[in-house]
Amino acid sequence: MANKKIRIRLKAYEHRTLDTAAEKIVETATRTGATVAGPVPLPTERSLYTIIRATHKYKDSREQFEMRTHKRLVDIINPTQKTVDALMKLDLPSGVNVEIKL
């Protein structure tokens, strides 16, 4: 290929599904003859939401919810055409967001 590196960035709310997706990508790339760097764990985004439990008063009674977004980075160095075809056909778990940069 003309490009020497494919960068894959994965995001998910559950780290187990994210790790299985990263494991599938790494296994597919190494099986087809490409060099893989990663998966590199990136910082986890933590969103915290605070709401009042009561509808009208009792402001001291609050409840907090948090949402964590886990991220991984996988670099595929010197990919072949066979590697790209295998990655396009790869079936990843639902709930994993994939961003690919060539």
UniProtKB/Swiss-Prot annotation:
GO cellular component, one term: ribonucleoprotein complex
Keywords carried by this UniProt record: Ribonucleoprotein, Ribosomal protein
A molecular function (GO) term: tRNA binding
Xref: InterPro entries: Ribosomal_uS10, Ribosomal_uS10_CS, Ribosomal_uS10_dom, Ribosomal_uS10_dom_sf
Keyword Ribonucleoprotein tagged: yes
Biological process annotations from GO: translation
Subunit structure: Part of the 30S ribosomal subunit.
Family membership noted in the UniProt record: Belongs to the universal ribosomal protein uS10 family.
PANTHER family on file: 30S RIBOSOMAL PROTEIN S10 FAMILY MEMBER
Role noted for this protein: Involved in the binding of tRNA to the ribosomes.
Protein name: Small ribosomal subunit protein uS10
Protein's organism: Streptococcus pyogenes serotype M1
Name of the gene this protein is made from: rpsJ
